[in-house]
């Protein structure tokens, strides 16, 4: 699901330099994509309320957006989820 606009900004703190996944370029790339795709305001998608900070996507679309393989995306999503950076919920 695309946000209503592709304008605006996200706040990224310098402390990110010390983040445990900062030195893994593919995980960092996926995390930044997630930050940029997150909804700024609540919205609805196919009758489901999507909260602020959440977004709807698929592994296939993340592969297309990042150039990573399905296995790479799944591995990095699992890492980000295990470390508490993201949560994954089926709609």
Region spans (language model):
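Long, low-complexity, charged/polar intrinsically disordered regions in eukaryotic proteins
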Residues: 1-25
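Winged helix-turn-helix DNA-binding recognition segment
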Residues: 3, 20-21, 38-91
């Amino acid at each position: 699901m695309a946000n209503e606009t592709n304008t605006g900004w996200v706040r990224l703190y310098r402390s990110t330099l010390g983040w445990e996944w900062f030195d893994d370029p593919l995980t960092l790339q996926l995390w930044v994509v997630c930050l940029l795709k997150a909804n700024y305001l609540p919205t609805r998608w196919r009758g489901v309320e999507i909260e602020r900070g959440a977004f709807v996507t698929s592994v296939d679309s993340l592969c297309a957006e990042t150039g990573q393989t399905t296995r790479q995306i799944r591995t990095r999503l699992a890492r980000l989820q295990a470390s508490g950076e993201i949560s994954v919920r089926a709609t």
